[in-house]
Amino acid sequence: MTKISKTNSIGQVQKHLTAECFNKLFIGGQFVDPIDGQKMPTHYPATGEVFHELPKGNANDIGSAIRAAKTAWADGAWANMPASARGDLVARMAKGIEENIEVLAAIEAADVGKPFRQAAMVLGGAASEGKYWASLGAVLDAEQDKPVNSGGGMGGLPPTEWDVVYRRDPIGIVGLISAWNYPLNVAFRKVAPALVAGNCAILKPSEIAGLSCMFLGKLAQDVGIPEGVFSVVTGDRETGAALVASPSVSMVSFTGSSLTGSKIMEASAPKLSQVALELGGKSAMVIFEDTDIERAVEATIKGCLTNGGQICTAHTRLIVQEGIKDDLLKKLKNVLEKIPYCRDPITEKERGDRAWETGVTDVIQPVVSASQHEKILGFLNEFEAAGIEIYTGGGVPDLADVKKSGGYFIQPTILTNVPRNSDAWQKEIFGPVLSVRSFSSEAEAITEANSTAFGLASTVMSSDPAKAMRVANRIRAGAVFATSTGEGLLAEHPAVSRGGFGCSGVGRELGIGGLHEYTELKSVNYSGFSIAEAKEKA
């Protein structure tokens, strides 16, 4: 692939999509056409036009991928390879992402509608994260045959009469179903640890936006991942359902909506297979009146509008102390109404003046699809009909060129005095919509923050460190940011495990805990001879 610059057009992106990896399934180490020969269109969110057709795999193609994986698993060479050696191959895949960031960023700009520079920045993070996963191969090797302290007087327990060690074995064949909002990042966050752990993995990207994920098949082929160890099958929900339902799939890792996650749990229950689910959120931004108001504005916009609000950790509930509510809302409205719309995410002609410095959120990108656009507008119509105040926004931007383009644009919207039991407060909208409630005391702030079934992330802003800590410790969420400045909001570090409470998920991603999700813990008991003897004669 040749590099693509920020000045390129949708037509030039299409030229890159003529590569085999973007037009065929990757099964058994080879690029193959779908058995039924079907395709599915993908649209450019800025205009609504179809710019490419993906291969549409079905249950039969999933069956082919599973047969290839079963052959590779039965061979045993991959599972028995040192994890550090598997990590070396994953590191080379990460390097391949790094070397093709400009191409992949342009593809994601076209596929998802996110600004090119944001896509490039995030993909750089995927490459770095892949290198981290690769480094954990050596850590996993070091964990093998680790002696267990079985008592020895601890707690009054006598030591065992035999030697015991722990091992971490790969699970087997794992199904990986990734989301559309950060396509390659979410996919590689599953693929990399699954492979380092020694599993055979089948990736099913989102049918809404999964083009960049298909490049992982090419990378796997280029670096020499053995045939059948990794496959990529694009398709619709039925394709994903076939992967989940297969008795040969011992674990499913999914990122997406809580509704789909619950269906995956239900489908996995009869075979008692494992699941790791990173699901929806309705994250709270709690702002105390001792917070610098300008920093509060910046943090609120970044928390709500990053990736157009299409991020599971989006802070779409603003819980603000009564003393600064009116001032904060006025400033938010003033800023939101000045942010330009990104009519062409690939070229990014509209960059914004960045006078208010909110990081990546200096343009309003389109939402990903017509169905998502319709869904968000439907929510807003329902909220207005229910009497919820639309403080700003609430519909399609009144710009002639945006309306003419057919793009999927939504005005950044603030809903005020939102009832706690309303859908505006309780449901994940997955768009640029912020719901607002106020509080007077710490106890009220905590109650408001914990007033939904979700628990993925939250932020507490205060200039008082002790207060920020007290409140953060009582919020039920997998990742809480306690800050006086808003810096680091939404940040992720590969070494820091995170996940959801409640309806936001099961299991953890990132860190050593994220790697362990793809392993089984086994104890091996030795008696009659020592562990050292066994290793010496192995």
PLM region descriptions:
Residues 143-295, 439:
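Rossmann-like NAD(P) dinucleotide-binding subdomain of oxidoreductase/dehydrogenase enzymes
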Residues 48, 86, 108, 198, ...:
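Residue-level signal for inorganic ion chemistry
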Residues 259-419, 482, 533-534:
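ALDH superfamily catalytic-core signature
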Residues 73, 77, 94-101, 105, ...:
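Structural signal for hydrophobic packing residues in well-ordered secondary-structure cores
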Residues 1-47, 72:
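Hydrophobic face of amphipathic alpha-helices that form TPR/SEL1-like repeat modules
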Residues 47-53, 249, 402-405, 409-538:
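Conserved C-terminal structural/oligomerization subdomain of aldehyde/semialdehyde dehydrogenase
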Residues 50-57, 74-78, 175-176, 285-288, ...:
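Short, well-ordered beta-strand elements within core beta-sheets of diverse protein domains
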Residues 51-143, 147:
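Glycine-rich loop-to-alpha-helix module at the N-terminal edge of alpha/beta enzyme cores
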